């Protein structure tokens, strides 16, 4: 390297990545001869790991199974597009327990959708914030225990909601089941209508944990607001209630199944 180091000037523009941009030790130089990566401060260089899809490419939803699961208020608004036909990769089956923290090597790269630079959210309940469960019925086993039991708890929303959840194809809860500093998602194995109880497919619930916050997501039964979406993972059909307004004519879908940038 030159004695005064090297500067890599990134030209302005958008750089669409199909894999993680990785920098390792040899890419940094030394403290005396550093390698500096930068763009012109008066211009912008974007690193992009997404696919852009025009809202006009979404078609009316015609799948009778999905339509029957949507709230009536959403049925005339929801439009869809086939990700498989577009060649966009996605996780076809969610595990029984997972998280999406990028700091973890085993983090699940979930599909993310953005509109006008802001994230849109999977159909969920409640639409904002968290609900809370009541009594812990079964502690369950730690997620690392192979073939471990899932925890169970009572939950008393309105009876019709719990009845809809009992018939859901794929019910996922995200919550702080063990600690207030750690949340994760867990598949529901069983909804007991008689006891108003939910049993997780996997995962430990701490009986002494007082917060007990969670929300349900990945549910077409709860798609009831503009900007919410649902992905039918078996056939790749992305269902979206388009956002209100005219801030953008397209949405962007995350493409990578790993970090956008990794520095080792």
Positions of predicted regions on the chain:
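Extracellular polysaccharide-degrading/modifying enzymes targeting complex plant/algal/animal polysaccharides
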Residues: 1-264
């Amino acid at each position: 390297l030159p004695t005064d180091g090297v500067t890599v000037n990134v030209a302005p523009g958008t750089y669409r990545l199909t894999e993680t941009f990785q920098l390792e030790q040899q890419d940094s130089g030394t403290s005396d001869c550093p390698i500096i990566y930068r763009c012109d401060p008066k211009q912008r260089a974007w690193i992009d790991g997404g696919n852009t899809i025009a809202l006009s490419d979404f078609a009316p939803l015609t799948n009778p199974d999905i339509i029957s699961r949507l709230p009536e208020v959403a049925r005339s608004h929801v439009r869809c597009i086939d990700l498989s036909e577009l060649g966009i990769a996605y996780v076809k089956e969610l595990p029984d327990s997972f998280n999406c923290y990028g700091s973890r090597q085993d983090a699940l790269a979930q599909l993310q959708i953005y509109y006008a630079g802001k994230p849109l959210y999977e159909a969920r309940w409640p639409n904002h914030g968290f609900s809370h469960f009541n009594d812990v019925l079964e502690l369950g086993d730690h997620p690392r225990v192979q073939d471990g039991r899932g925890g169970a708890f009572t939950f008393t929303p309105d009876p019709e909601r719990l009845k809809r959840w009992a018939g859901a194809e794929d019910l996922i809860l995200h919550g702080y089941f063990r600690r207030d500093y750690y949340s994760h998602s867990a598949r529901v194995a069983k909804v007991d209508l008689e006891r108003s109880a939910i049993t997780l497919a996997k995962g430990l619930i701490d009986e002494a944990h007082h917060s007990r916050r969670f929300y349900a997501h990945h549910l077409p039964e709860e798609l009831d607001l503009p900007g919410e979406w649902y992905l039918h993972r078996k056939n790749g059909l992305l269902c979206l209630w388009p956002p209100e307004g005219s801030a953008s004519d397209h949405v962007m879908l995350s493409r990578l199944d790993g970090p956008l940038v990794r520095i080792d």
